Structures are given as C-alpha cells and as structure tokens.
Amino acid sequence: MSEWVAWHDGYAPGSALTRRLEAVQRMIRAALDALPQGPISVISMCAGDGRDLLGVLPGHPRHNDVRGLLVELDPDLAQRAREHAAGVSPSIEVVTGDASRTTPYTGFVPADIVLACGIFGNISDDDVHNTVANLSALCAPEATVIWTRGTFAPDLTPTIRAWFTEAGFAEVDFVAIPDTTVGVGANRLTTPPRSFEPDVRLFTFLPSEERPSRRGGR
C-alpha cells in the first residue's frame, strides 16, 4: 500500500480530513452554483480517489453539465477514482499521470473550476508560489481555484492568499477549520488567464521527511 492510499484511508467521521473534505465540497458546490447555464469543466490536480468532486455531483442540479478531468499519479488511487466516477457520470475522465506538469491538461483546458487540494503542504514554498502564479493557464475567464494548505507554524496561508491576489485572483472564501491545522481557500480569476503551454513544471513533491505537511494538515 502506498503512502497516499494509506492517507486516503484515514478519513473518519469528525476527523480533520473529513472536515477538510466538507469545506472543499461546500466551496465546489458554491462554485458550481455561481456559474452561468451551459457546460462546466472541472480539473482536479492530484485528485486522489476523486472524492472531492465525485462526492458533490450526485444530486447537484448542475450534475449533467459537468465534464471533469481527474489527474492522479498513484495507480491504485486513480483506479479507485475511475471506479467511483463510472457510477457518477460518463463525462468524468480519470488520468493516471503527473499532475505537477501541465501536459495531462492538454486538450481539456480551460477549466471553470480547478481543484488544487492536498498539494501545497507537500511542496516547497517556492513551488507553491510558482504554482499559484501559473494556475491561470489552466483557467477559463472567471474560473474558481479551490486549494488547501495546513495552517501549522509557520503559517504560509496568509502569504498564499496574497500570492493569489498578485496572480489576478480575488478571494471568494477562506476558512481555517477550528481545532485543526487545516486551511481551505477559494479564489476567482479576475484578470485574463495566461496562455496554456504543455510540459510546464508547476511543482515537485518533496521527500516525505521534508514536507511541510509533516507538521500538520495538507
């Protein structure tokens, strides 16, 4: 069992992971609700087993409007996501691939919603900044990016929020979940998106012992 499969198996009622999931899904619902009528495209980077998006779509009024691309490197998690997606919507594609580079998104962008959850706590501060600066290349105009990062010391979330502003995003929502070290944010693109280029490196996961998430939530 990989470390990422073990991490996903850590969800339990009332746990910090579950409360994070609830916050992410609330922001996904809000983003879907805010979009005009018509097709909706969603990208989930480092999608894991896909529960962030796949747990929202059933029963949501925009369910049939959504096409999704879930990118996950771990083959076991990608297969879990694929099996889950098959029972949710035929318009969800799961790719076993490297979400840290832009190549897997070729042919799918621009997206109306981009999920960058479980990433910022596992990469260097410089790579967080680089990712935020380049996320608009995956985005349609006025797209929403939903992201997570632990609020453990030293808390980088205020800086990340400022980086989103610098990158042309307005903050829609941010919550530091009480009694946890979990932060979840949503930002809407308010400036023209960057041009998409394939094979651009966004980030690199650090070795396990060097990851900021070792100090708390991801």
Regions found by a protein language model. Give the residues of each.
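Conserved class I S-adenosyl-L-methionine
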Residues: 36-48
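A short SAM/SAH-binding and catalytic strip from SAM-dependent methyltransferases
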Residues: 111-127
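Conserved SAM/SAH-binding beta-strand->alpha-helix loop
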Residues: 74-76
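Conserved SAM-binding loop of SAM-dependent methyltransferases across substrates and taxa
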Residues: 49-63
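S-adenosyl-L-methionine
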Residues: 79-108
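Class I SAM-dependent methyltransferase Rossmann-like catalytic core
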Residues: 1-37
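Conserved beta-strand signature within the Rossmann-like core of class I S-adenosyl-L-methionine
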Residues: 139-151
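SAM/dcSAM-binding transferase cores
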Residues: 173-218
